[in-house]
Design a protein with these regions (language model features):
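A general structural signal for well-ordered alpha-helical segments in protein cores
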Residues: 11, 70, 85, 145, ...
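A structural preference for short, pocket-lining loop segments at secondary-structure junctions
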Residues: 11-19, 30-77, 92-101, 120, ...
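Glycine-rich phosphate-binding loop at the start of an alpha helix
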Residues: 67, 82, 86, 109, ...
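CoA-thioester-processing core
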Residues: 88-94, 102, 108-162, 175, ...
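Acidic, divalent-metal-coordinating active-site segment for phosphoryl/phosphodiester hydrolysis
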Residues: 165-171
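C-terminal long alpha-helix characteristic of the crotonase
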Residues: 21, 57, 122-127, 169, ...
Length: 256
């Protein structure tokens, strides 16, 4: 377990919150493991009816998550064939019960792509969304190469992936990436209010409704596997090395 993930249970609702503000809530392997354990426990728990992923202390420039902690990942994956990040992505993909994302700050990389596996996505007005994989010499992950075009359209998805552009909450709502947007001042209260609507709904009906809508698990799994091969290859590539070096030096990357 890690102190950088806060897990709370209240009134049939599980809250899983990023709690690493000093690192912009960048996600480490330990954090992925803690989230995986929480999602898997929730999936087989009849008492709790909704799980919400959010961040503590967002607002005033704080982040939902800045994505993966590259320094932590550079030390090498744990369980080479099934690292914690892959376990987490499969856990949220396979979860039969409602998952909610309450995005209360910038959501970068996996911060965006994890929302594609959530059934409801609420965003604060100040939240933003970006998937700058190509800027890092990487490729889309979490089946986002399949799910993002379906959510916002092929042209918009290619714009997000290829330019690394940042979407505002207003744009994300208009495109269909998020379910609802709320003013920052009321966001936490409204997100919890709606999460409780889900938590208090008929549980079997909710499960069946989710299963009917999200009925393409095999296709999504295949896409995640294909992405992971390209992602792993790019992690070992000169392009990734140049991208990280340029980012650390705050200078433009050069790809010969």
């Amino acid at each position: 377990m890690t102190d950088h993930i806060r897990i709370e249970q209240s009134d049939r609702l599980i809250t899983v919150a990023f709690n690493r503000p000093e690192k912009r809530n960048a996600i480490t392997q330990d954090m992925y493991q803690a989230m995986t354990d929480a999602v898997n426990a929730y999936a087989v728990d009849d008492e709790n009816r909704a799980l919400m992923i959010t961040a503590d202390g967002a607002g005033d420039g704080a982040y939902f998550t800045a994505g993966n902690d590259l320094q932590d990942f550079a030390m090498g994956p744990r369980g080479e064939n099934n690292p914690p990040v892959i376990q987490f992505l499969h856990a949220i993909k396979d979860c039969p019960k409602p998952l909610i994302a309450a995005v209360n700050g910038p959501a970068i990389g996996v911060g965006l792509t994890l929302t594609l596996h959530c059934d409801l996505v609420y965003a604060a007005q100040s939240a933003t969304f970006s998937a700058p994989f190509v800027k890092l010499g990487l490729v889309p992950e979490a089946a986002s190469s399949l799910l993002l075009p379906e959510a916002i359209g092929m042209a918009a998805a290619m714009d997000v992936f290829m330019t690394g552009r940042t979407l505002t909450s207003e744009e994300a709502l208009r495109m269909g990436l998020i379910s609802r947007m709320f003013d920052d001042a009321e966001f936490d209260a409204r997100a919890r209010e709606l999460a409780m609507v889900v938590a208090n709904a008929a549980p079997n009906a909710m499960r069946h409704a989710k299963a009917l809508v999200r009925n393409r698990n095999a296709e999504i799994t295949d896409r995640m596997m294909a992405e992971s091969v390209h992602f792993a290859n790019q992690l070992q590539s000169p392009e990734f090395g140049e991208s990280v070096a340029a980012m650390m030096a705050k200078s433009p990357a050069f790809y010969p």
